[in-house]
Amino acid sequence: MSRRRYSVFLDLLRQARIDVGMTQADVARKLGVPQSYVSKCESGTRRMDVTEVHAWLDAVDRDRVTFMLTLGHALDAQGLQTFPPSRF
């Protein structure tokens, strides 16, 4: 995933936390990790794998499918195709 695409993903992930009124420390407690882990994930310093994203979305009580659809729409709106045609 390109930096621009990953940045859109991180913005949505961060916004999901903020929308439910949770701090980074709140998410960290739910995940059983240090607050610094949440900070590094949100800043893009630490990339997340799919299982970590699922756990994060569960922690902030977000539906996974809805989140992914929202991500796709956000990428499309910014002209960042989800799957570049040249790759398929």
Give, region by region, the residue ranges found by the protein language model.
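DNA major-groove recognition helix of helix-turn-helix/homeodomain DNA-binding modules
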Residues: 51-69
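Residue-level signal for the short linker/turn that defines the boundary of a DNA-recognition helix
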Residues: 11, 21-22, 48-51
